[in-house]
Swiss-Prot record:
A motif (Di-lysine motif) lies at residues 203-206. GO terms for cellular component: endoplasmic reticulum membrane. It comes from Dictyostelium discoideum. The lineage of its organism: Eukaryota, Amoebozoa, Evosea, Eumycetozoa, Dictyostelia. GO terms for biological process: endoplasmic reticulum to Golgi vesicle-mediated transport; intracellular protein transport; protein localization to endoplasmic reticulum exit site. This is Endoplasmic reticulum transmembrane protein YET-like.
Length: 206
């Protein structure tokens, strides 16, 4: 039992150092780096098994200390044993030791679950930030694509406008050419009439 309590005390010291470090006014970047290194260190399968076994041992010592402390307290306050001859001072010393062990184990378990939960929260925050960075990058790429499409759309609108203008000019030139041809044929017909000649179409009919 003394060996287990020594082990629990060492674990408690490590947890206190760990929590004290993260209560210091250090940058969030440094905290994340430490958390990431610890996650790599204790994220393996063997490390997880070791931590679970260690937590189980602390829980066993905690429960054993509470049970023994309760039994000794009950023994000291039992009316039948009040007048019995036994070393009450020794029993009080044992009860004090078990109560001390229960306090140390309880605080150790509390810090253990606190650190475990904070590690999970930091891991979730890191994943959220990574997702946020990826989303921001994708959004930026989408905005660049949209800007490129809008620019191409403006160019297409300009080209369509120019094509419509050219089409109108072509229609105007075509109409003008048709009018010029009609006028030319009319003048040629009048000219032929003045010369007393028949049009080619009439000659073919003859």
């Amino acid at each position: 039992m003394e060996f287990l309590m020594t082990l629990v005390f060492l674990v408690l010291l490590v947890e206190i150092v760990f929590c004290t470090f993260f209560m210091l006014p250090v940058s969030m970047h440094l905290r994340k780096n430490v958390y990431n290194k610890l996650d790599k260190l204790f994220g393996g399968q063997n490390a997880k098994i070791f931590l679970k076994v260690l937590a189980l041992l602390v829980i066993i010592v905690f429960c054993d200390s509470i049970v023994n402390s309760y039994n000794i307290n009950k023994k000291l306050h039992t009316p039948e044993l009040t007048g019995a001859k036994f070393d009450r001072q020794n029993e009080y010393t044992r009860m004090f030791r078990y109560q001390r062990n229960s306090y140390i184990c309880g605080f150790c378990l509390y810090l253990f679950f606190l650190i475990y939960r904070s590690q999970g929260i930091i891991s979730q925050l890191s994943n959220v930030e990574a997702s946020k960075t990826a989303i921001e990058k994708q959004t930026k790429n989408n905005l660049n694509t949209v800007e490129t499409l809008l620019s191409e759309n403006e160019k297409l609108k300009t080209e369509i406008k120019d094509l419509k203008k050219m089409e109108k000019e072509h229609k105007a030139m075509k109409s003008q050419a048709e009018n010029t041809t009609k006028e030319y044929l009319k003048l040629q017909e009048e000219y032929n009439q003045l010369l007393g000649k028949k049009p080619k179409t009439q000659k073919k009919d003859d």
